[in-house]
Design a protein with these regions (language model features):
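P-loop NTPase switch/coupling surface
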Residues: 1-155
């Protein structure tokens, strides 16, 4: 299983960013603040809906935070397109700021649920001996938090 396409609309610094991804390797390079982490966070948000529904049917994934909505906009939308053994499927997730109308903007997570059900059925059918998707995510805030203010030894 791999991501074919990821689309960020009004998400953080991106107004409308469709990304066609390679099935083998994708490298994101850029200066600080250009959106590399936003792309990875958007992927993590979208894949969390599948991962959580594999664990528990109907479970929710990570929502788009109101702070993720682009400044000056009333809503944000993320869409993901995946491919698994030649079958393409996807879902989208929307968030509207408080006080704004949700008209014409809705999350559609049917294929996340259907895919999770298929994976759950495979796990049950093969007594847990089945390959399942692996999603690894390391956020930016992984820095060392405890740095001594003084040096204790002479160098």
């Amino acid at each position: 299983m791999h991501i074919n396409k990821l689309t960020l609309q009004r998400f953080r610094g991106a107004q409308d960013l469709p990304l066609d991804l390679d099935d083998k390797l994708n490298v994101f390079v850029g200066m600080n603040g250009t959106g590399k982490s936003s792309i990875l966070d958007a992927s993590a948000i979208m894949l969390s809906w599948l991962a959580n529904r594999i664990k528990h049917a109907g479970a929710s994934g990570r929502p788009i935070a109101e702070s993720d909505i682009r400044n000056g906009e009333s809503s944000a939308n993320l869409a993901i397109q995946l491919c698994d053994e030649g079958t393409s499927f996807g879902w989208n997730l929307a968030k509207v700021r408080k006080g704004y109308s949700k008209k014409d903007l809705a999350s559609v997570l049917i294929f996340a649920s259907e895919t999770a059900k298929g994976i759950q059925a495979g796990i049950t059918e093969h007594n847990g001996k089945v390959n399942i998707p692996l999603f690894a995510y390391y956020p930016v805030n992984r820095a060392v938090l405890d740095i001594p203010l003084r040096i204790r030894e002479k160098h």
